[in-house]
């Protein structure tokens, strides 16, 4: 089916099913273009609270679709393909959390939303890269257990001055781990007038070279501050920024900074998922109830 016809059919099915499409900033441009809501993890979580639709098609990775389902237990949530997974979320196990709690029984468990629903059920609060430092700073504890991203944990510790225990010790995003000091040096040489916007999932040594350290939502908000930027996150963010700020220049720090899970979703997947109402996201009620408390606490605190 041709692209124009595919989009036409998706829109027809959306109306027929009373569906909306939520998409993350890392999605392919053609999916960003058809999304009803587009944003980072925090923005999408906020949007998911009061959705006026019967069906949510989530163009993101699995943990994001799970979060939408947890916040909307009565609605149908579709993940267009089961291949849209997050490797980092799968690095954190329940065993990691239980072992950390044995060592630090009084420390609250703070989990990045990039985690499974089962893990979130053990959390005191969830966070996103946009609000992690703010929320940890508000907690009445000088020690927190934080997972699964060790680099975001480093950033939070630096901003808050608190002791942040990463679980697992080497949890990371393989896309952001690609960025190195060599990329920083190359960016400075190629684009001497540009500033560097760096995602806090990047390695600490790369964060230290940043002009600003921000989530993808923060990148959108702060891009107005300068005319040229080198973007240290998933490459599709450059497309999003360029559309929002056509008069400014944005350069990907690496052309190969690609999230396989995010790119697993195509227009055809969205069409087939809506047509057949397949790949429904389900979260067991007991897990969802516990995880919902941690997510709702995040939304209240941010």
From Swiss-Prot:
Disulfide cysteine pairs (residue numbers): none
From the UniProt record, list the reaction(s) this protein catalyses: iminosuccinate + dihydroxyacetone phosphate = quinolinate + phosphate + 2 H2O + H(+)
- The reply on keyword Iron-sulfur is yes
| EC top class, as a word | transferase
For binding [4Fe-4S] cluster, which residues are annotated in this chain's numbering? 86, 173, 259
Cofactor binding description: Binds 1 [4Fe-4S] cluster per subunit.
Keywords for the protein's UniProt record, in alphabetical order: 4Fe-4S, Cytoplasm, Iron, Iron-sulfur, Metal-binding, Pyridine nucleotide biosynthesis, Transferase
Alphabetized GO MF terms: 4 iron, 4 sulfur cluster binding; metal ion binding; quinolinate synthetase A activity
A Pfam family name for this chain? NadA
- The keyword Metal-binding belongs to this UniProt entry's keyword annotation: yes
Instruction: Report the locations given in the UniProt record.
Output: Cytoplasm
Ligand binding (iminosuccinate): 24, 41, 112-114, 129, 199-201, 216
What the entry lists under SUPFAM superfamilies is as follows: NadA-like
Q: Name one GO biological process term.
A: 'de novo' NAD biosynthetic process from L-aspartate
Q: Which InterPro entries match?
A: NadA, NadA_sf, Quinolinate_synth_type2
Q: Which family does it belong to?
A: Belongs to the quinolinate synthase family. Type 2 subfamily.
Its job: Catalyzes the condensation of iminoaspartate with dihydroxyacetone phosphate to form quinolinate.
Identification of the protein by name? Quinolinate synthase
């Amino acid at each position: 089916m041709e692209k124009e016809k595919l989009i036409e059919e998706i829109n027809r099915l959306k109306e027929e099913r009373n569906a909306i499409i939520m998409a993350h900033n890392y999605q392919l441009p053609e999916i960003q273009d058809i999304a009803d809501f587009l944003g980072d993890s925090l923005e999408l979580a906020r949007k998911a609270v009061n959705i006026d639709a019967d069906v949510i098609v989530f163009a993101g990775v699995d943990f994001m679709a799970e979060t939408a389902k947890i916040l909307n237990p009565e609605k149908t949530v579709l993940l267009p393909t089961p291949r849209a997974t997050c490797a980092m979320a799968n690095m954190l196990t329940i065993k990691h959390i239980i072992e950390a709690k044995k060592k630090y029984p009084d420390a609250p468990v703070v989990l990045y939303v990039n985690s499974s629903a089962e893990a979130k059920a053990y959390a005191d609060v969830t966070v996103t890269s946009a609000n992690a430092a703010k929320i940890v700073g508000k907690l009445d504890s000088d020690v927190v257990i934080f997972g699964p991203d060790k680099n975001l944990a480093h950033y939070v510790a630096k901003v808050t001055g608190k002791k942040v225990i990463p679980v697992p010790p080497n949890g990371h995003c393989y896309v952001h781990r690609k960025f190195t000091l060599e990329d920083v040096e190359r960016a400075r040489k190629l684009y001497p007038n540009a500033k560097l916007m760096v995602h806090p999932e990047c390695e600490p040594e790369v964060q230290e070279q940043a002009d600003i350290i921000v989530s993808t939502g923060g990148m959108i908000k702060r891009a107005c501050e300068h005319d040229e930027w080198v973007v240290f996150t998933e490459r599709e963010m450059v497309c999003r920024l360029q559309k929002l700020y056509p008069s400014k220049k944005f350069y990907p720090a690496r052309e190969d900074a690609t999230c396989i899970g995010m790119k697993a979703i195509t227009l055809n997947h969205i069409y087939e998922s809506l047509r057949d109402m397949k790949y429904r996201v389900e979260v067991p009620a007991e897990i969802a109830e516990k995880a919902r408390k941690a997510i709702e606490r995040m939304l209240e605190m941010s």
